[in-house]
């Protein structure tokens, strides 16, 4: 067993594999992408549109100006991240560009640095702060541009397939080349609508003679094959056929006839070169349509005429206009852009076809073309592209296995944050070009040009702000705990702009594909409608320069491990035989077994050890970070592992975090890269530590303390966060884990964040569990817990909620924040300061009696003049403004909330600037609430084993061990077999061994502890502590005899007991429970609102009405539909009657009936209501 040190903790690892590369920077994908955008991307976009010119020719001279962008830099951020969060600002920095303006006529130049405006930038934690809120831009998985060979689905049963070569650009009109095997013809489909004969398209590529085009698509006929010859009668021959004596038998371009076949046989000619059958039939169909004889060439003019007639019907044909229109469609980079990625993919795909073309058409030597790559540079299509694609398409009939799989990762690329923001910037900037040109054209002299006034990118700033605020890929950050944050930054989504639609995504798109191995996690994905569309990056996966996912492998040469690591994309991997890293190696790195299972293409095959090319880098390579935190993952069903992965992200940080006894070794990396653990920036010695600050004196390479020239110590100061609210209202608090005098290394943790313990992720607690049914209290996944967990605050968490109120300008005067509130006793304002704002440290929300809720911010709103009585007017004239009537509109603590005020922020319009329309003052109050474990709270393990607390039992009534220790949690044993998550059983036993031996274990995924490593060792330790009763020494099971805490009697059978890591999830009962007596009503139908947020009521729907009807409970039903709902007059009368202890009045007419009548009147129907005597009733008065 290996050991490794993490800070002050030693972990014992069961892992057998030595990993030669460390876990990479887990948020590199976000950081690198944004850095690339700032360092190169923005300048590349600015230069793409340079020069912007206003030059025009006057007489013989060119006049005007050229404007070009020479350089670009980013200034310092305007505010700190903390300030932006407090003041609800966006974290921005100014962008500057060096602009050069050139006078075209004189060549004179002027250069000046101008501001492009303030733009949102990434924080050190790879997030964006937009209007005070942290957001993450998620990476998007989209189809890569390029060319795809696919089979088009046909609706006709029994029909032959239609093969497509599909050119997919980043921008421009789609072009598809179709091979229809039913009518044996080739077509070009333009923009998924218009279909043309393919020969017309080929004619526009610059070929004069038809035979030259046909020669590009040859086929070879065997003269002895009667069937093929009969099928090919009438086909065009593509070469001059000469007999052995030198006599010309047939000229190039002649037609194959039965007579010619006989002559060929007589002369002993075995093979002849003819036109491909499908190309010939395509050509003949066009000839028939155009009613032209075979020997006559189709002119380029005629081809353009036919194409134009199809694409622009009804328009007058002009040759130059038609040629320009067609060339702009596919051969102009401004209209049709493949992009650098699309060109790279296309060149890669067409390389073999190009080599074949060089041999067949240009007659090159096969050996000379072996190393030639297809290296076309244009970002638009070229004639040779189209020819090579057609040649490949013609081969798909014989080799359908060469067709592309849409769901293969080689056909998908990742658009990272930098690219998404860059394309938004480019789109907005392209709209500003015309405006700059127009301004530039107004100037006549270089000296008079004001460069800053030329560059006004207000629309670009607005567009980027809109992107961050509204784009589905810019998301409100999941910040429940550090792993939730880390996972959000590593998320891949296939939905969003330019991606898939959730409703239309096929099962195949969502499914796990073999190319995902080591790139995308096959386990971590949501359970709902997004399943398979939103995924997570695997641990070691990264992105190459073109946006394709790559994963590392280690080379194997002649069955021996090499130290070389290679990163492969999904298509490159297909050519190699790759073994798992868990196969057996000797000490020198040689593979021990003769035959090894390897991944090759889509299959797993057995090969000789010398045939193995590569080996995985790590057993956890296949899964994501969250999934790699599940111990014994290999023993869990995939569906439960999925739930375990997702629930770890919902774990609430508890007051005293505790690292798991049974980890996987990934806890350290997950915590470090989450951004919540404070890391030392340099080597040093700790000089000062308190709850808010750590000061470290730097040391040099020799271990000597460093001082500046004046003799002052060079120090690093770290400020810790205390009770900061996260996006999900959990508390972010950092606490030091170093002492004065400690030596710290660069990069080592010096302070823990939320849910971390000594630099390791700590999402839950190690608790003593027993798998035992107990009086039905753990029926159906319910959980029985001990009162001990409450006494020790095991699952108590702190949540910070923010409440805000604004003082606005109203029509009758401004609202005022004050402690002088009408009709409020001194008792209720005892915690308010002189300004009417609650003092920090006050405990609010604890209600002893049915009194009004505590006031957080006292606020009064002036009443309108119109509703002032004559008496009030006299009072006002006597006392002036002091007598002015106001109504209480204070901010109060909501129902069911209690906690301590930990912060108050007041913003005044004069100091901050704009707070919103009509707002003078904004007050935010932060309330910290302590939430201990309660009945109804959701608990979960790491194996998808979740449940709700059903009862909190006194610890003396809990089942107890032979030494008297009561268990803390009782789980149902029926939750294990059907769920097939046996990992929890192994974790429980290993957890007990860890506790008894005072050790922490690591059991890496797919390389962890076996049952035989745990149970015999556990039995030995239990025997020394006299805890072995109920277990078999020859075949230990980890079970023990338990006694009932209430009776002291033994249970009938031994019970599995041990320590399991359990988390409390964000689904807290206290936040969901809700009750209403009287509350707000909907304005139109006057029924109570719904939901806790609106302090709403319970909906009594039509099915509930049927239930009361079925029981004949007429009075109850009458009440439900009237006075308890929308009978306005009736419910007021009932309230009065209850308060005065009188009999309840008769119900009146519900508002919903009036609404129905009004709706019918809106349909121009005259609806009248009559009583039993036939008198008309005015329902508006009822």
From Swiss-Prot:
The EC category is: transferase
Query: Please, one GO biological process term?
Result: DNA-templated transcription
Gene3D superfamilies (alphabetical): 2.40.50.100, 2.40.50.150, 3.90.1100.10, DNA-directed RNA polymerase, beta subunit, external 1 domain, DNA-directed RNA polymerase, subunit 2, domain 6, RNA polymerase alpha subunit dimerisation domain, RNA polymerase Rpb2, domain 2
Question: InterPro entries, per this entry?
Answer: DNA-dir_RNA_pol_bsu_ext_1_sf, DNA-dir_RNA_pol_bsu_external_1, DNA-dir_RNA_pol_su2, DNA-dir_RNAP_su2_dom, DNA-dir_RNAP_su2_hyb_sf, RNA_pol_bsu_bac, RNA_pol_bsu_CS, RNA_pol_bsu_protrusion
The molecular function GO annotations come to: DNA binding; DNA-directed RNA polymerase activity; ribonucleoside binding
Q: Which reaction does it catalyse?
A: RNA(n) + a ribonucleoside 5'-triphosphate = RNA(n+1) + diphosphate
The reply on keyword Nucleotidyltransferase is: yes
- Keyword Transcription in the entry? The reply is yes
Question: What UniProt keywords are attached to this protein's entry?
Answer: DNA-directed RNA polymerase, Nucleotidyltransferase, Transcription, Transferase
Show the NCBIfam families listed in the entry. PRK00405.1, rpoB
Assembly and partners are described as: The RNAP catalytic core consists of 2 alpha, 1 beta, 1 beta' and 1 omega subunit. When a sigma factor is associated with the core the holoenzyme is formed, which can initiate transcription.
What biological function has been recorded for the protein in this entry? DNA-dependent RNA polymerase catalyzes the transcription of DNA into RNA using the four ribonucleoside triphosphates as substrates.
Protein name (record) = DNA-directed RNA polymerase subunit beta
């Amino acid at each position: 067993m290996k050991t490794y040190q993490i800070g002050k903790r030693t972990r014992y690892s069961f892992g057998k594999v030595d990993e030669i590369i460390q876990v990479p920077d887990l948020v590199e994908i976000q950081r690198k992408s944004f850095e690339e955008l700032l360092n190169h991307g923005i300048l590349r976009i600015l230069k793409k549109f340079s020069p912007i010119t206003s030059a025009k020719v006057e007489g013989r001279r060119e006049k005007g100006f050229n404007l070009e962008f020479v350089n670009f830099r980013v200034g310092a951020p305007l505010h700190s991240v903390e300030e932006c969060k407090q003041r609800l600002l966006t974290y921005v920095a100014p962008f500057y560009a060096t602009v050069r303006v050139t006078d075209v006529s004189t060549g004179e130049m002027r250069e000046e640095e101008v501001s492009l405006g303030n733009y949102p930038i990434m924080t050190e934690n790879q997030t964006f702060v937009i209007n005070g809120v942290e957001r993450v831009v998620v990476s998007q998985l989209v189809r890569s541009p390029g060319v795809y060979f696919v089979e088009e689905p046909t609706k006709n049963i029994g029909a032959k397939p239609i093969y497509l070569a599909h050119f997919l650009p980043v921008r421009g009109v789609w072009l598809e080349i179709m091979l229809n095997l039913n009518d044996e013809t080739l077509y070009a489909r333009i923009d998924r609508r218009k279909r043309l004969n393919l020969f017309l398209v080929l004619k526009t590529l610059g070929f004069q003679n038809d035979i030259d085009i046909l020669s590009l698509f040859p086929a070879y006929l065997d003269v002895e094959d009667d069937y093929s010859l009969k099928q090919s009668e009438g086909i065009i021959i593509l070469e001059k056929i000469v007999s052995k004596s030198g006599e010309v038998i047939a000229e190039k371009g002649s037609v194959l006839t039965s007579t010619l076949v006989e002559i060929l046989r007589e002369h002993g000619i075995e093979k002849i070169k003819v036109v491909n059958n499908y190309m010939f039939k395509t050509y003949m169909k066009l000839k028939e349509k155009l009613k032209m004889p075979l020997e006559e060439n189709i002119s380029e003019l005629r081809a353009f005429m036919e194409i134009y007639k199809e694409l622009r019907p009804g328009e007058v044909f002009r040759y130059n206009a038609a040629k320009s229109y067609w060339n702009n469609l596919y051969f102009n980079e401004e209209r049709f852009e493949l992009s650098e990625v699309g060109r790279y993919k296309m060149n890669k795909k067409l390389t073999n076809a190009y080599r074949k073309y060089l041999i067949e058409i240009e007659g090159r030597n096969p050996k000379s073309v072996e190393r030639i790559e297809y290296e076309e540079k244009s970002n638009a299509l070229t004639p040779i592209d189209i020819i090579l694609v057609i040649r490949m398409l013609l081969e798909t009939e014989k080799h359908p296995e060469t067709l592309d799989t849409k769901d293969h990762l080689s056909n998908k690329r990742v658009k990272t944050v930098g690219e998404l923001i860059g394309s938004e910037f480019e789109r907005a900037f392209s709209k500003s070009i015309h405006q700059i040109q127009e301004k530039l054209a107004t100037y006549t002299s270089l000296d008079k040009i004001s460069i800053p006034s030329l560059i006004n990118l207000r629309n670009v700033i607005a567009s980027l702000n809109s992107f961050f605020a509204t784009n589905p890929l810019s998301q409100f950050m999941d910040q429940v705990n550090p792993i939730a944050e880390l996972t959000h930054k590593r998320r891949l989504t296939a939905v969003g702009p330019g991606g898939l639609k959730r409703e239309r995504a096929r099962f195949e798109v969502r499914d796990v594909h073999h190319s995902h191995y080591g790139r995308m996690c096959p386990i971590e994905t949501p359970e709902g409608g997004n399943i398979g569309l939103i995924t997570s990056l695997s641990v070691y996966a990264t992105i190459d320069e073109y946006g394709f996912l790559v994963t590392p492998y280690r080379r194997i040469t002649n069955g021996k491990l090499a130290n070389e690591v290679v990163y492969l994309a999904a298509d490159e991997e297909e050519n190699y035989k790759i073994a798992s890293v868990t196969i057996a190696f000797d000490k020198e790195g040689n593979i021990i077994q003769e035959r090894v299972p390897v991944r090759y293409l889509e299959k797993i095959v057995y090969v000789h050890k010398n045939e193995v090319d590569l080996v995985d880098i790590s057993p956890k390579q296949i899964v994501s970070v969250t999934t790699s935190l599940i111990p014994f993952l290999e023993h869990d069903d995939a569906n439960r592992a999925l739930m375990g992965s997702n629930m770890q992200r919902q774990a609430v940080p508890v007051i005293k975090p505790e690292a798991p006894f049974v980890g996987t070794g990934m806890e350290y990396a997950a915590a470090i890269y989450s951004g919540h653990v404070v890391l030392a920036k340099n080597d040093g010695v700790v000089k000062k530590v308190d709850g808010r600050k750590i000061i470290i004196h730097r040391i040099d390479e020799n271990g000597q303390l460093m001082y500046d020239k004046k003799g002052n110590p060079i120090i690093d100061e770290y400020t810790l966060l205390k009770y900061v609210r996260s996006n999900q209202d959990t508390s972010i608090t950092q606490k030091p884990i170093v002492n004065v005098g400690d030596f710290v290394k660069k990069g080592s943790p010096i302070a823990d964040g939320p849910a971390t313990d000594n630099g390791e992720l700590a999402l839950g607690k190690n608790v003593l569990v027993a798998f035992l049914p107990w009086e039905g209290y753990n029926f159906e996944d319910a959980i029985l817990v001990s009162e001990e967990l409450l006494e020790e605050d095991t699952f108590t968490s702190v949540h910070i909620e923010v409440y805000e109120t604004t003082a606005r300008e109203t029509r009758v005067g401004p609202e005022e924040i004050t402690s002088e509130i009408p009709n409020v006793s001194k008792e209720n304002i005892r915690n308010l300061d002189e300004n009417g704002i609650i003092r920090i440290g006050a405990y609010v929300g604890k209600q002893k009696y049915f009194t009004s809720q505590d006031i957080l911010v006292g606020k009064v709103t002036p009443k309108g003049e119109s509703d002032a009585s004559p008496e009030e007017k006299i009072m006002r004239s006597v006392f002036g403004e002091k007598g002015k009537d106001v109504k209480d509109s204070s901010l109060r603590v909501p129902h069911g909330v209690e906690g301590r005020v930990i912060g108050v922020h007041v913003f005044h319009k004069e100091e901050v600037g704009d707070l919103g329309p009509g707002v003078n003052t904004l007050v935010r109050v932060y309330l910290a609430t302590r939430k201990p474990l309660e009945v109804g709270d959701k608990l979960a393990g790491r194996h998808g084993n979740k449940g709700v607390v059903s009862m909190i039992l006194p610890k003396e009534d809990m089942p107890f061990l032979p030494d008297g220790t009561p268990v803390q949690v009782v789980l149902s044993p029926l939750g294990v077999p059907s769920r097939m998550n046996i990992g929890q059983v192994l974790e429980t036993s290993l957890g007990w061994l860890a506790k008894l031996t005072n050790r922490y274990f690591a059991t890496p995924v797919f390389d962890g502890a076996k049952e035989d490593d745990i149970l015999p060792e556990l039995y030995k330790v239990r025997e020394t502590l006299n805890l072995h009763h109920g277990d078999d020494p020859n075949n230990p099971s980890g079970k023990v005899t338990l006694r009932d805490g209430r009776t002291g009697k033994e249970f009938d059978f031994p019970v599995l007991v041990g320590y399991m890591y359990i988390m409390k999830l964000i689904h807290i009962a206290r936040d969901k429970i809700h009750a209403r007596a009287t509350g707000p009503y909907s304005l139109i139908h006057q029924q109570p609102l719904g939901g806790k947020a609106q302090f709403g009521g319970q909906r009594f729907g039509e099915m509930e009405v049927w239930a009361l009807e079925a029981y004949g409970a007429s009075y109850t039903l009458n009440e439900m539909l009237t006075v308890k709902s929308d009978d306005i007059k009736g419910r007021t009368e009932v309230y009065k009657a209850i308060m005065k202890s009188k009999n309840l009045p008769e119900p009146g007419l519900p508002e919903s009936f009036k609404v129905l009548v009004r709706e019918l009147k809106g349909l121009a129907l005259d609806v009248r209501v009559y009583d039993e005597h036939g008198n008309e009733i005015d329902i508006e008065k009822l």
